[in-house]
From Swiss-Prot:
GO aspect biological process, one term: isoleucine biosynthetic process
Cofactor(s) it depends on: [2Fe-2S] cluster; Mg(2+)
Pathway(s) it belongs to: Amino-acid biosynthesis; L-isoleucine biosynthesis; L-isoleucine from 2-oxobutanoate: step 3/4; Amino-acid biosynthesis; L-valine biosynthesis; L-valine from pyruvate: step 3/4
Disulfide bridge positions per record: none
Catalytic residues identified in the record: S517
Keywords, in A-Z order: 2Fe-2S, Amino-acid biosynthesis, Branched-chain amino acid biosynthesis, Iron, Iron-sulfur, Lyase, Magnesium, Metal-binding
Matching Pfam families: ILV_EDD_C, ILVD_EDD_N
Binding partners and assembly: Homodimer.
Gene Ontology MF terms: 2 iron, 2 sulfur cluster binding; dihydroxy-acid dehydratase activity; magnesium ion binding
Official protein name in the record: Dihydroxy-acid dehydratase
HAMAP family: IlvD
NCBIfam families named among the record's database cross-references: ilvD, PRK12448.1
Protein family: Belongs to the IlvD/Edd family.
């Protein structure tokens, strides 16, 4: 029988000092010998996706204690990518993922915790905690803060749905009045929760369902809805059950690495492709797989992207649907159900509920079940009231959306496209691959050939776009923004948004060794690997070079003679593969991150060969 990890600090006379300190935290005599469960919270007033989490940790803790465990809460940091966007703050976003993973490991191992509940929500917090969970491999349940309600406003006598990206695009659109821009800004983000589209935060919270590490509805039930409270309560109960099964019954099938195995990672990636999720999820799944010691690579992603259709289109890929609509259509269990019926899912994987994925789909897929409680849960909808309070409303749709022909979620037969929502491209410009969200690319530019216009930083690219330097037909190349070159691999949401603001959204392509926000759409190709700072060919591109992009054939090519490229490479070798005339202060902390960072095809994790 596995011994409780916490026994190291709670048993024996030699641990009298540790027990004295445990008592000072509130533990009683009969608590020693119970599993000590870390409640890993991420509350902060900086982030709307986390502003409502202050009391969630204790909500979970009380359930843990009712079920027979001892709960101890601590907090991690949380960066708001939207607020950090467009300035030097974005350099810190991706590095914070690894810092979160390390901080969770430090706290859990230092205090010998037996299990944990991870309360996450936004872009780097869920993947950071996921990396920690798979690294530690102790019983764990994920529960997130939930999505924000979509914004709504009336413009030109028409009610329109909004999100953060609309505020950014229209704020830079010279054809939009100051009054309309201000109205959109005030209406775009009405409640607490992770931004309302299928951006990175919501994508990752959805993927935890496919990985089997969170409960059904975790990715889609609104932050404001009363139904979400039950997810927190159930997480507290379930983690104690997992502890009993592992520590008392010697059942290691409940551990994160047993649940999130190779098949589960393939399920998560298939879900991501089917729902047109954020390209950042590729980065995070690759990183998490390495923590789990799962052999999951860009080659697997390429293979899956050629098999899985696009079954759901949500903002930013359309303004018709947001996360509240995904929930009404049955949430992630519904998309997984459609993938299962198309024989595109490993349904024998396990979940934290102790079920196989097939059993969980049968119970929670609204197309399969007649259970009124399940249908009621997925009818949970928005209230349209500005608030920062969780569980503050109980509004419901009259019906669920089970239309698999024309609804938010579709069957394979009626898919938005038989080609999936994400694709990996390769060629001389990206020998180790690059990623594009095909769900956000207009059909007219799936094949695109244009002249390169090169920028050595995101800031210069923004100035070039807004200043009129970028013209229709250009391939905007933004380099030295990768994990090493940034350092920190900034998101390029402002450049892609400003291309739309300037009317160039369907007339230009953008290629970068940086990454994109989940809010990005258009012909935006990121994660170019190897990155410029690692000697990638993107570092050799010059203004006017012809670049050919062919998404259907998964190809990206720089049309320059090999002899010329060899000469350019020799010049860069002398220069040390550094950006030219870039004005950027880089802190010591970021330099450390950049020194150890691998390229995006490896998940931008630390290079262990350098340690």
């Amino acid at each position: 029988m596995p011994k409780l990890r916490s026994a190291t600090s709670t048993q024996g006379r030699n641990m009298a000092g540790a027990r004295a300190l445990w008592r000072a935290t509130g533990m009683k005599e009969n608590d020693f010998g119970k599993p000590i469960i870390a409640v890993v919270n991420s509350f902060t007033q900086f982030v709307p996706g986390h502003v409502h989490l202050k009391d969630m940790g204790q909500l979970v803790a009380r359930e843990i204690e009712k079920a027979g465990g001892v709960a101890k809460e601590f907090n991690t940091i949380a960066v708001d990518d939207g607020i950090a966007m467009g300035h030097g703050g974005m350099l810190y976003s991706l590095p914070s993922r690894d810092l979160i993973a390390d901080s969770v490991e430090y706290m859990v191992n230092a205090h010998c915790a037996d299990a944990m509940v991870c309360i996450s929500n936004c872009d780097k917090i869920t993947p950071g905690m996921l990396m920690a969970a798979l690294r530690l491999n102790i019983p764990c349940v994920f529960v997130s803060g939930g999505p924000m309600e979509a914004g709504k406003t009336k413009l030109s006598d028409k009610i329109i749905k909004l999100d953060l990206v609309d505020a950014m695009i229209q704020g830079a659109n010279p054809n939009v009045s100051d009054e309309d821009s201000a109205q959109i800004e005030r209406s775009a983000c009405p409640t607490c929760g992770s931004c309302s589209g299928m951006f990175t935060a919501n994508s990752m919270n959805c993927l935890t369902e496919a990985l089997g590490l969170s409960l059904p509805g975790n990715g889609s039930c609104l932050a404001t809805h009363a139904d979400r409270k039950q997810l927190f309560l159930d997480a507290g109960k379930q983690v104690v059950e997992l502890c009993k099964r592992y520590y008392e019954q010697e059942d290691d099938s409940v551990l994160p690495r047993s649940i999130a195995n190779k098949k589960a990672f393939e399920n998560a990636m298939s879900l991501d492709i089917a729902m047109g999720g954020s390209t950042n999820t590729v980065l995070h799944l690759l990183a998490a797989a390495q923590e789990a010691e799962v052999d999951f690579t860009m080659a697997d992603i390429d293979r899956l992207s050629r098999q899985v259709p696009c079954l759901s289109k949500v903002a930013p890929n359309t303004q018709k649907y947001h996360m509240e609509d995904v929930h009404r259509a049955g949430g992630i269990m519904a998309i997984l159900g459609e993938l299962d019926r198309a024989n595109l899912l490993h349904n024998d994987t396990r979940t934290v509920l102790g079920m196989s994925l097939a059993e969980q789909i049968a119970k929670y897929d609204i197309v399969l079940t007649k259970d009124e409680a399940v249908h009621k849960f997925f009818r949970a909808g928005p209230a349209g009231i500005r608030t920062t309070e969780a569980f503050s409303q109980d509004c419901r749709w009259d019906t669920v959306d089970d239309d698999r022909e024309n609804g938010c979620i579709r069957s394979k037969t009626f898919a938005y496209s038989q080609d999936g929502g994400l694709a990996m491209l390769s060629g001389n410009l990206a020998m180790d691959g690059c990623i594009v969200k095909t769900a956000g690319v207009d059909e007219s530019i799936l094949k695109f050939t244009g002249d390169a216009i090169v920028f050595e930083s995101q800031e210069d690219a923004v100035a070039g776009i807004l200043g009129g330097k970028v013209q229709a037909g250009h391939v905007v190349v933004i380099r030295y923004e990768g994990p090493k070159g940034g350092p920190g691999m900034q998101e390029m949401l402002y450049p892609t948004s400003y291309l739309k603001s300037m009317g160039l959204g369907k007339a230009c392509a953008l290629l970068t060794d940086g990454r994109f926000s989940g809010g990005t759409s258009g012909l935006s190709i990121g994660h170019c690997s190897p990155e410029a700072a690692a000697g990638g060919l993107i570092g050799l591109v010059k203004d006017g070079d012809k670049i050919e992009i062919d998404i259907p054939n998964r190809s990206i090519q720089l049309c320059v003679a090999e002899e010329e490229l060899a000469q350019r490479r020799a010049e860069q070798d002398k220069l040390g593969w550094q950006p030219v005339n870039r004005q950027r202060e880089v802190s010591f902390a970021l330099k450390v991150y950049g020194h150890f960072a691998t390229s995006a095809d490896k998940g931008a994790v630390r290079d262990k060969t350098k340690i």
